[in-house]
Amino acid sequence: MAKHYLLYGSERYALAILRPVQEAIRARGGEAAWFFDGPGAEDLHPDEKLLTTTEEVRRWNAIAVTTGSKAVPHFFPGVKVETFHGFDAGKPRHIYIRGFFDLYCTTGPRDTAQFKAIADKVGHFSVVETGWPKIDPFMQEIAGDLPPVRQPPVILYHSTFSPSWSAAETLYEEVKRLSRIGEWKWIVTFHPKMSQDTVAKFRALENEHLRFADDDNILELFPQVDMMCSDTSSALNEFLLTYKPVVTFKNRRPGPQLLDIDDPAQFAGATRTALS
């Protein structure tokens, strides 16, 4: 009898994170089903199994529940596994034990060391450094040399939703001004929890030079652009894997891999520098 697994999502981005896990489960002869407590179920493929009630989950009787979310229902059958929903961007509570999980599948050595140190103290969960499943198919796609910069260049503008770290409102007027000039093309996308007022403001900027994207998998946008502008979003760490430049506004953890600015007046100049 095939082993059952449950993939648990609370946002649409769970699909991009957990589909590689589903592929691995199927390759080993197992069966995966999905359960959502938020958006995402509507984007499942015909060959993907959806459970919609806790009774169905109990009958499925998974040996493991895997999620990128920070919490999971403790009464679902199976070992609880967290794969994370992004790289560490330097925000508070990235390393935070909530008592939901039996296993943390960490993305790299830094997280592994910190989680193992806690595991040694509390003793109620395990840690295995697995890498991040969302990146697996993407790394195969970006192999090879960087393509030349488009003319005009295309910029991906992405912001986190956290009010303390988001630069969306601060840079709105500059994005508005620059998107009307035509020097560059823009694709704008936000974290799904971004304020709907902010989303509406940027969506209203759409014109021949700017497109607002609702893609649930931001990785699909990376091949379409030449650089990223962001703030303290974990998505910029994903983008850096492409070796394309990133301009940030008041990043919490700046470094030589970023062109970090602290004044909207520097935005256009930093963007030109990144593209040069």
What feature does the model see in each segment?
Residues 1-11, 156-157:
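Nucleotide-activated donor-dependent transferases that construct or modify glycoconjugates
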Residues 6-141:
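Active-site and donor-binding regions of nucleotide-sugar-utilizing enzymes
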Residues 13-28, 134-202, 272:
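Conserved catalytic-core segment of nucleotide-activated headgroup transferases in glycan assembly
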Residues 31-46, 181-214:
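Catalytic donor nucleotide-activated moiety binding site of glycosyltransferases and closely related
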Residues 33, 65, 81-82, 103-105, ...:
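Hydrophobic/aromatic beta-strand patches that form the interior of the parallel beta-sheet core
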Residues 61-63, 78, 102, 153, ...:
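Conserved acidic residues
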Residues 75-84, 215-258:
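A donor-sugar binding/catalytic signature common to diverse glycosyltransferases
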Residues 121-129, 205, 234-276:
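Catalytic binding pocket for nucleotide-activated donors in carbohydrate/polymer assembly enzymes
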